[in-house]
């Protein structure tokens, strides 16, 4: 297989880059792009490569074509689709860069063979995602076979629930799943799609397309018992007491709003999604850890939370839950809160790596063509 020449859009702290590494494919990241200064600082610290801070919208068709990339990986801004956000979809200016990339895709002379996209669950919300509609319109127009997924790290053995939308697309060729192959990769017949107006907020033309909750042929972890306890993700260079002192939840916060926290014990086998507001806001931003299991809280008494020794996950511990390799480090120039913000905007490396394996795997026809080339080369 040819080397992947990758453009990594919205690169953040390099989740897609690490996904490429873990997948085992031969690749080169030609250029990464992000407007976040701290993300680019850490990307440079990690990979010793500079990300472009130039806005994606300012790149012309000719400039993007000049990279000669055959793979585009991207995790566009999720705020227009988040559960706690305004959900303005394509009316949110933060979608402009993504729409620009889709426009470039229709004009570029040599479009990328492979595309992988990650976003929040709400990106494909039924009846109200014009952005998703435009994505699928573009993929169909440009002759891509594609498959959408809703996947969570827990399915891959990680003690974390973070349901996300993924889409993989391959141009001029079918995707190759290990099993159930005949059930997927179907060409989308636009005449069979529901063409109801988006304005009725009831059904979009793509609502009937199946979004898979698994990767066909992948041996998923189906129960919590198959996941490690969250204590296995703890930083090992500090004792439990030291971790508590370094990341403890302030007592005044526990006394005022303590019962809003999602509390997990050290032997729990799951944790809730960490957002970029972790460590700053409380409800819906991620789990905290009970370091002393000898006490139980009284839901009517916030003072009962104090003996539990409640602390936040460290930034490094969260990256382990996100499937980042142990070699990953944060720049010492970043504060803990800045690290939390970067992690909350990141993605799960393990899931990306498994989807990349499917994306680049040759289908039966491509394997036969490759074998024929090898035979001709031996003559």
From Swiss-Prot:
Residues 178-192 have a biased composition (Basic and acidic residues). The keyword Endoplasmic reticulum does not apply. It comes from the Eukaryota. Disruption phenotype: Mutants exhibit altered gene expression, and after undergoing 16 development cycles some mutant cells displayed reduced growth on axenic medium. DIRS-1 expression was unaffected but Skipper expression was increased in mutant cells after 16 cycles of development. Mutants lacking dmaA exhibit culmination defects including fragmented, transluscent sori, and fewer spores than wild type. Its EC number is 2.1.1.37. It is an enzyme of class 2 (transferase). PROSITE patterns: SAM_MT_C5. One of its GO terms (molecular function) is DNA binding. It is found in: Nucleus. It catalyses: a 2'-deoxycytidine in DNA + S-adenosyl-L-methionine = a 5-methyl-2'-deoxycytidine in DNA + S-adenosyl-L-homocysteine + H(+). Keywords: Chromatin regulator, DNA-binding, Methyltransferase, Nucleus, S-adenosyl-L-methionine, Transcription, Transcription regulation, Transferase. Residues 193-203 have a biased composition (Low complexity). One of its GO terms (cellular component) is nucleus. Residues 4-366 form the SAM-dependent MTase C5-type domain. The keyword S-adenosyl-L-methionine applies. Residues 178-205 are annotated as: Disordered. The active site is at residue 78. NCBIfam families: dcm. Belongs to the class I-like SAM-binding methyltransferase superfamily. C5-methyltransferase family. Involved in epigenetic gene silencing. Methylates specific cytosine residues in the retrotransposons DIRS-1 and Skipper. This is DNA (cytosine-5)-methyltransferase.
């Amino acid at each position: 297989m040819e080397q992947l020449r990758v453009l990594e859009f919205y690169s953040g702290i390099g989740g897609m880059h690490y996904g490429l590494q873990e997948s085992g494919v031969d690749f080169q990241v030609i250029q990464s792009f992000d407007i976040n200064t701290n993300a680019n600082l850490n990307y440079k610290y990690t990979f010793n490569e500079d990300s472009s801070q130039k806005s994606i919208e300012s790149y012309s068709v000719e400039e993007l074509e000049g990279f000669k990339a055959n793979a585009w990986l991207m995790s566009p801004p999720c705020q227009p689709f988040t559960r706690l956000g305004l959900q303005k979809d394509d009316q949110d200016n933060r979608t402009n860069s993504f729409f620009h990339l889709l426009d470039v895709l229709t004009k570029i002379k040599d479009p990328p063979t492979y595309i992988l996209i990650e976003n929040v669950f709400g990106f494909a919300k039924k009846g109200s995602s014009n952005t998703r509609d435009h994505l699928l319109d573009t993929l169909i127009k440009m002759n891509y076979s594609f498959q959408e997924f809703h996947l969570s790290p827990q399915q891959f053995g990680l003690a974390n629930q973070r349901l996300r939308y993924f889409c993989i697309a391959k141009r001029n060729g079918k995707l190759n799943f290990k099993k159930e192959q005949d059930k997927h990769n179907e060409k989308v017949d636009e005449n069979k799609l529901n063409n109801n107006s988006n304005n009725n907020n009831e059904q979009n033309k793509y609502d009937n397309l199946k979004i898979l909750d698994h990767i066909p042929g992948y041996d998923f972890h189906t129960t919590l018992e198959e996941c490690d306890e969250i204590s296995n993700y703890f930083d090992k260079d500090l004792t439990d007491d030291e971790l508590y002192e370094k990341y403890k939840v302030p007592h005044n916060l526990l006394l005022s709003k303590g019962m809003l926290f999602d509390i997990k014990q050290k032997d729990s086998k799951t944790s809730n999604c960490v957002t970029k507001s972790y460590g700053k806001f409380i409800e819906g931003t991620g789990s905290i850890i009970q370091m002393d299991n000898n006490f139980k809280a009284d839901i009517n008494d916030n003072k009962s939370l104090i003996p539990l020794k409640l602390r936040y996950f460290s930034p490094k511990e969260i990256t382990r839950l996100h499937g980042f390799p142990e070699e990953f480090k944060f720049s010492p120039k970043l504060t803990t809160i800045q690290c939390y913000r970067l992690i909350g905007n990141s993605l799960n490396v393990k899931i990306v790596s498994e989807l990349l394996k499917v994306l680049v795997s040759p289908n039966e026809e491509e394997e036969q063509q490759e074998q024929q080339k090898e035979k001709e080369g031996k003559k």
